Amino acid sequence: MAFTKIALKSTVAAAGIAAAGVLAPTAFADPEALQFGQTAEVPSPGGAIDYTVSNLQPSGHNDGIWYSDVTARAVSGFPTPNIADFNARAVNSSTYANMKGNQTDGLPNQPIAMGTQTSGRVYFDVRSGTAPDSVVYRDAGGTDKVVWTD
């Protein structure tokens, strides 16, 4: 009888530990760290996109506007580049959202067919902050997914 109680308690404890492991929240992974010019695959509405980010620099008009060149290549489906998920970040962690205008040389926010690509610039308003040194792709929940730096 004592053996049965011990076996039952052990079974319940093992089941509890297993359930805790299954139900535990997934740990957040560190974002993928890349050099400017390298490519990262990111899931997007309608498919997946390989993003290549390069040339983070001031616009040259002494107005505090910075930009980065971005190429988006559709890897699967018929995805739409999500320009709103790009941010510039400074070494002091200041983060600058992209400027959501319709710049003539901006990255198009339109679906792209699988195997094709589109390129353009993503602009950031850094007028009152520290100069950025990286471009960050964040998902809709605000989690950093990819960071491009020098």
Spans of model-derived segments:
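Membrane engagement elements in two modes
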Residues: 2-54, 59-62, 116, 129-130, ...
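Histidine- and aromatic-rich ligand-binding microenvironments
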Residues: 16-17, 107-110, 114, 120-121, ...
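Short beta-strand/loop motifs in extracellular/secreted proteins, especially
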Residues: 49, 82-84, 133
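Hydrophobic residues positioned within well-ordered beta-strands of beta-sheet architectures
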Residues: 51, 68, 120-122
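Short glycine/proline-enriched turns and hinge-like loops at secondary-structure junctions
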Residues: 62-65, 80-82
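Short, well-ordered beta-strand segments enriched in hydrophobic/aromatic residues
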Residues: 64-76
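The feature marks short-to-medium sequence segments in extracytoplasmic or secretory-pathway proteins
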Residues: 73-118, 147-149
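Short, surface-exposed ligand- or partner-binding patches at beta-edge/loop junctions that are enriched
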Residues: 121-146
